[in-house]
Regions:
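Active-site neighborhood for divalent-cation/phosphate handling
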Residues: 74-174
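Non-catalytic, solvent-exposed interaction/assembly segments
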Residues: 1-102, 142-146, 151-155
Length: 175
């Protein structure tokens, strides 16, 4: 990941950007701004008007006089599924393949239509299984978000799930 990254929230009613700078005591806010979107530009997390989103991002960058091009974005809405599952315990190097096979039973989308990731929550539960959070996001949605960022001449270094991004921000602030 880039050392300095701007958080870019592509929301249903506005685009928001936040720039933080690491200090000795934590983080300091160096820039924040919001650019409204025309209604129906983004509906249920799906980008309906890519050109309008790109223009809003560019306008926000210009108004805030941001020079940093590396951004972190998050995906939310109906195109993201998060589910806690347990799988038979296996070697770490076999876990990726096992999860890809297991995911078919837990997500309502075709496996070829999604990006899949996971986080191990408990390597061995009392029943000898590995508990994990399975995350699936529609590939088309991820591609649309990445494309508007690139079309705005920015570089997406992180594509996260919105709820996880919020949790990570909370943990950085209060741990």
């Amino acid at each position: 990941m880039a050392k300095n990254c701007i958080g870019l929230d592509i929301g249903s009613s506005s685009i928001k950007a936040v720039q933080l700078k690491k200090s000795r005591t934590g983080y300091a806010l160096t820039a924040f701004g919001m650019q409204p979107l025309v209604p129906q530009t983004i509906v249920d997390g799906a980008i309906m008007d890519q050109a309008a989103v790109v223009e809003a991002i560019r306008a926000l960058w210009s108004r805030l006089k941001l020079r940093q091009k590396d951004v972190a974005i998050a995906i939310a809405g109906h195109s993201v599924i998060i589910k806690k599952i347990a799988v038979p315990q296996t070697r770490a190097d076999d876990l990726d393949n096992q999860i890809k096979q297991e995911a078919e039973h837990h997500i309502p989308f075709a496996k070829d239509d999604v990006e899949i990731d996971y986080h191990v929550v408990n390597p061995q539960n009392p029943m000898g299984q590995t508990e994990l959070l399975l995350v699936a996001a529609k590939r088309e949605t991820v591609a649309d978000y990445v494309q508007v960022v690139r079309d705005a001449s920015l570089t997406p270094h992180v594509v996260d799930v919105a709820s996880f991004a919020s949790q990570n921000g909370f943990e950085v602030n209060y741990n």
